Amino acid sequence: MSTVFNMDKVDFTKQPMFFGEALNAQRFDVFKYPVFDKLTQTQLGYFWRPEEVSLQKDRSDYLDFRDEQKFIFTANLKYQILLDSVQGRGPAMAFMPYCSLPELEGCMNAWQFFENIHSRSYTHIIKNIYSNPSEVFDTMLDDEKIIARAKSVTKSYDEFIEAAQQFTVAGKGTLREVKTKLFLAMVNVN
């Protein structure tokens, strides 16, 4: 049974990373895989706010770009925002419901938080360079090439989510099949 807080005493050092017992207290003193806690600490050390960075030079540089350079610059920002939007919610939607290690849960929370900051940083750039940022944001989903690239990442997330839900809710498929989809999704998004 899935629950927000498992009331049973569980030794999480003996649990698999995924599809083990539901989590309870977020203990950060004993780890099965200390590398995840170290990664979380490293990520937290990189915390910054995009608004703290001056973009005056970027704006003047952008104004000097040729039209094709502006197009490439803008398309890249759109793509980065789209991918960071996926990564900002993907780990929580796909992997967290099946996570069974507190240190991995913490690491994934930090991961998606920093993906959100990345997306904010690109938004900060757009807001400082374009007189009407909505023109950029409103056309983001109109670019077929950006959408095609995004589909290549979201496909594996979606396939894992579907397989995991079918397995846990409807009893369809096997745990091995679901874990294969999990592996493919993790490799694809990393």
Predicted feature residues:
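Non-heme di-metal
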Residues: 2-190
